[in-house]
Each structure stands twice: as structure tokens, then as C-alpha cells.
Amino acid sequence: MMSQQLIDFIDSRTRHPYKSDEVEKFQQEVNELQLPDPNSLPILSEEEKRQAREDAAFRRSSEGLEDAWLDSAIPADPTPIFRDTVELLCVYQSFVKKSASLDTVANFLDFSTDFSTLSTKKDETEIAPDCLHYIAELLFQKKEREVKEKWKNELTEKLKTLFNWPAINPNLKESSKFESFFGFVRSIQSFKDSETGLPLFMQVYITPYVNQFRYHFMSQKQTNVLSKPEWFFEFLLKVFRSNRSFYMLMRDIKFFPGVPPFFTFINLLNNVAKEKLTHIIKYDDYLVHLVHETLQYSVRLEQHFHYTQDPLIIFLFEQNGTYDKWLGLETQLSLTKLEDIKIASDAWELESDQSDDFSSAVPTKMTVRFRDMIETTFSVLQNLPSLDYQFNFWRSVQLKPMMQYVNWLEAFYESHESSSSIHLPGSLQTDKSKFDIAEVERMCKLYSNFKLLMDWLDDIEDEDVYIRIGHKMGSENYAAFYQVKPRLSTLTNGSFRMILRAVSQTLRPLLDNYSDLDTWVIKEQLPGAALLSTSVSAEIVGFQSRLKEIIALLQKLLIGSSQCEAIYQIGTLVESWMIKIVMTHQFSVRGGVQFAMDAMQIVLEFSDYPLLKFERLMSTVELLSLESGENKLIKKLIIEINQKNYDFIDEFFKTKEITLSYEDALGVLYRRVDAWKD
């Protein structure tokens, strides 16, 4: 039979359950129970347990009923002693006794284990009062709070004493004296703060930094400036830099599976930063700058600390409507800057200070400004956290204004392609008295815009981010700008041809005046008179002067291969014009010599370009200026060529360095009047 003390305890707590403020009473009463050894009690069968449950239920249902009608002569059955009930009460008693001595982590772990056992253990006879588990849980919670508060105080004191926390010394070298502290941290690493749910150590450790953050950036302090997110990001980075060495000493402690403790520290402070971000994103005026600084912060975390977990930019973009609003603001900002670039009064002026950055032409100011505008967005593009974000940003903020810019330039190209009389805006409205040379300048500047854009795109397309974007679009060779580059290539080649056309339209009238001379056939001078004139023809001076001016202009506006190609093309054009003059006129010896002097004067203007040899022109004037002499050399050469006596001709050509074909040489020789005179 069960002892009267046990019966009274069970009976009392069945009828009067413990209340939430009776934890100490529970401890006292359970401690005072005199419990028999459970092993001395019989093991009940399932049928006996069922019967016990029914009896207990009956007794509970009878509580408070009037029993006068019951037959008092029938004695009550004795209360049996049940092993299940006693075993459960033994666990409660052990649990209560341990709650009095929780001075070590091991003791608390043992205490916690007993509570876990209580949580799963039940009295199958259902005799033990139901309130026991409830009040035991309250006891556990109370003791847990007390112990954790004690540990937090201990952590705080040791951190201050050993590490001068929170002003942690970043150059910790002697780690052996800290082993005891880290052993303590390791022993409680699985325990969470009751209020925040954070690991107990981390809750203690981050508290002063969180308080500093809130004080400076979430209060009425002057450091709380919405337009300066870089201030609180720099504060966080400074905190991380000063604490990194400390966390290296405890890198084997894991508060969360797979997460180094230093990253846990960063995560927790980033959570505070998220509160700040959600406040700033309400203001459109600050959103673009906020995103840029958040991206830069994430980059610096990765560069300095190899941290890639939970980027704040993802949190920012996932706030309702924030990403779309930011992208719209970035797009509008780029288009506004583009309009400012186009309408600037100095847009078409040369940016000579930037010429070293380009290999084909001296850029206009608007080209440099447009390039700089796009390049300032590159770091944002590169640092965005996913390809989808990057693609959308590139399409809206880079490609869209680029297409508009090219369309705008193409309109000028089409106007000039159909008529060379249409002026470009800004500084290109030059003096009409110099319209001819100004047209060359305009075409060079138009060409430089197309060419430099083309070269610049070739350079930046090798960046990984553009390769990934090109791959996403499925473009050939993964070229991100495949939509615009073919157009730029066509416009570049076309505007280069327009430079040559403008040069031709400027020079050709002057050379036509020269070719209209009727003095090529001049009577031979008297015997003994000087054959050669001492100066070039007056009529060639205007052509030479304008040619010199054009070459100087091209040297000013074009660079490298573009400059060489343009001047080579002009040299070839001039050579063909001069040869055409020869082939459409007749020359005396004196006229041929004069033409040769004029031609040499023109060739000298190209002396900076040794690859331009003018071999056809030089060979032509060499034959054209031959003296007849007594041997009738001109006629002899004609006869030898006609008779195909090429040995003599080859030897003569070699001596004079003539490279013309026999047919072309014959044509030049016939231009001499003495070739057909007796």
C-alpha cells in the first residue's frame, strides 16, 4: 500500500493543482516526499494499469460529490503502490534537488537532461497529478534564466578583463592564457539567449556594437544622415576589422552548423543594418546612392573577409518594389545624363588631354563623357549579385542609352552622306570662309565618335560580366553588344569614306585649276640657257597649301592607324590625279621638268609617311622629264619598247629606278611632244 504521505500529496495536488507562482512550494514538497525504492514494487500488467487508470478517473470524477447515499458499510479498497507512479516521482525529486546546485555547466546540463526526461516520461497509471509537469517546466525556465544570466555576467567580465572588450586588440599574439575562457565558451556554445534566441555568447558579444550602431545611426545624432549610408557601412567594417583576430582564436567553435563564428558575428550586425536599410528605402532621392554603397559594402566584405553569406543587397532588392524602383531611377538618370552630353555647347570640341586613352582618333568631349558615363555604371553592373540582376541593369542602364546615342550620331551621318552642306552642332559651326576644310574636320569628328565607340566596345566585351550576358542572350561569340556593333562598324567605315570624300571635294577644284594650264608645251630654250626653273608653278601653290593644311588637320584629329590610313588614301588619290594630268596633256622637255618639280613638291608633303613611295608618279615624272639629247632618247625608248627589246629597256629602267610597266611607260613617253616630231 502507498504511504499516507504520498497519498496525501497526490490527493492534495489532484484537487488543488500548483499555480504558476508556487514553484518554491513545489520544490519543498517534492523534496520532502519519502519515496519507496521502485525496485521493491511489483511491475503492473497492462490490465492492472488499465484498471488503475479507471480507478483514478473514478476518484477524480467523484471529487466534491455528496456521498451520503453511498453505502458507508462498504469499506474502501486499499490504494495500491504503483511502480510507474513512484518512478516518475523519483525523477521529479531528482530534478528538484539538482535545481539547488547549478554552479557549473555540467550541473546545468545534467539538470536539463532530467527535464528532457520528464518531458517524455509519463505515469501510465495516471495517478500522479497533471500539474507536476507544468510546474516543473516553470522551475526549469526560472533556473535556466538565472543560470544564463549568471553566464552572461561571467562572459562580460572575462571579455573585459582578458580582451579589453569591446575595444578588442586586433593584434592578439598570446593565445594560451585564453584557453580557459574559450573552453567555457565552447561548453555553452549550444545555449541560446531566452529573449533573442541568439547563441548566448554572441548575444553578449554583439550587444555593445549594436548599441553603438543604434546610438549613432538610428537616433537623433548628427551621424544619422539618410544620404550617407557609407558612414554606417564604414562603422561596421571598422568593427569587423578590429574583431577579426579575436575570432580567429575561436574559429573551431561553431554556434551554427557550418558557419565560422566570425561570419556569425557579421551576420548578426548585418541584421541591425537591415533595420536601417528598410527605413532609407522609403526615400527615392537616396535609393540609388544607397544601392551603390550597399553593393560596395558587400564587395569589401568579400575582399577583406571572404564573406559571401546573406548579402545585404539581396535583402534590399527583396523589399517590396525596391528593385524595380531603383532600376527605373538608374535608367532615368542615365538618359538624363545622355541628354546633357548631347546638348552641351562644347560637345564636339576635342578632348586632347584624353587622346592617350585612344588609339585611332582624338576624341570629342561628348565621346569621353559618354564613355565615362557608362563606365561609372560598370562597377554597379559587375557587383550585382546575380546574372538576372546584371542583365536587366545592362539592358536598361547601358544598352538603352547607347542605342539612343548611336541613333543620334547616325542622324548626322545620314545627313552628311546625302549632302555635305549640313552642319553639325556646337563648336562645328565654323567660319563659312573655311567651309571646305571645316567639312573635313566635321567628318573626322564624326568618324572619331563611331570609331572610338567601336574600339571601346571591343575592349570592354572581354569582361566576364559581358561574356555572361552575351551567353544569356545566345549571341554569337557571347558578344553582349552584338546588336549595336555591326551598325557601328558600318558607320565607322562609311564616315571614314566621307572624310576622303570631303578631302577630295576640297582639293580637286584646286588641282583642276592647275591641270587647266596651257603652258605645258613650252618652246625649247635657246642653246646654253638653263634648262631647269628655280621654282614650282604658281598654280600648284594653292593646292599644296591646302594639302598641307589637310594633312596637319588629320594629324591633329586622327591617331595611329586611322591617321596613316587616311593619309595613305589621300596620297594614293593625289598620285592618281597627277598621273591623270600627265596622261591628258602634252609636254615639252621644259614642261615635263616643270611638272616634275611641281610633283616633287607635292610628294614632299607626305615625307612623314615613308610607306607612301609614289613609285608610279616618280617613275612617270622621271620619263616625262628626260632630255632628248643628240641620241633622240625619247624616240629610242619608244622604238625599243615597240620592238620588244626589253633588255635595253630593263637596264635603262633599273638605272633610273623606274617601276612602270612597258605599256604605261610607252603611254608616258608619247606625252612628250618630241616623241612624235621629226
UniProtKB/Swiss-Prot annotation:
The RINT1/TIP20 domain, residue ranges: 99-678
Localization per Swiss-Prot or TrEMBL: Endoplasmic reticulum membrane
Keywords annotated in UniProt: Endoplasmic reticulum, ER-Golgi transport, Membrane, Protein transport, Transport
GO biological process, one term: protein transport
Keyword Zinc appears in the UniProt entry: no
PANTHER family xref list: RAD50-INTERACTING PROTEIN 1, RAD50-INTERACTING PROTEIN 1 RINT-1
Entry protein name: Protein transport protein tip20
Organism: Schizosaccharomyces pombe (strain 972 / ATCC 24843) (Fission yeast)
Gene name per UniProt: tip20
